[in-house]
Amino acid sequence: MRDMKANKNKMKFNYAGMTFEVPAECLRTTDYWGKPLETPYINIGRKEVASMSKAFVKKNYPNLLVWGSSETFANGNSVSVYVCNSNGSDLDIESKEWKEIAGFVHSLSGGKYNGWEEIYEYGDGFVTENGTKIESWAKYVHCNNSAPHGSWPSAVKCLKGLIAGEYVFGPLNMEKAIEKAKGYGYSESNISKALELI
């Protein structure tokens, strides 16, 4: 526990060569009945996993673009992390960067789904650099080597595809491609940024 520092609202701990900051309530010092725990531990959820993943990419690969989001639904939650090159192109899944990023992101998962038996199998957790246990309640953690839908890199791909005729309705001129892209949920600002790069 020597690697943890807590103040009123946040706490810090070291994991994977980095210092991470999470809400102070992630540190569990009592059980569900309020009795002090002999060995306190850190409990992270979907928001913390998304935040830690983004921090990892920004520190280790500042030249890459990263997004993170999380959702809660009946009986679970999910985290999606998106990483791409600075020009918006997909990150090569054979690259050292991708393998390291995907490995880190997946290390934060709370377990995995066993499709054969149709059950979710919780993992054993992991530990900080000084041995404090970390439990993750992020159930489904995904790492993607491309930008998320609606972002400017995704808008670049969409517009190029619309102009090149990669969609069922054939090639479109720029004006019609922009209208279609808006219909697909791309914002004016992301379309404008994409147009600068086409």
Regions of interest found by a model, annotated:
Residues 1-3:
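Short, Lys/Arg-enriched N-terminal segments with co-localized hydrophobic residues
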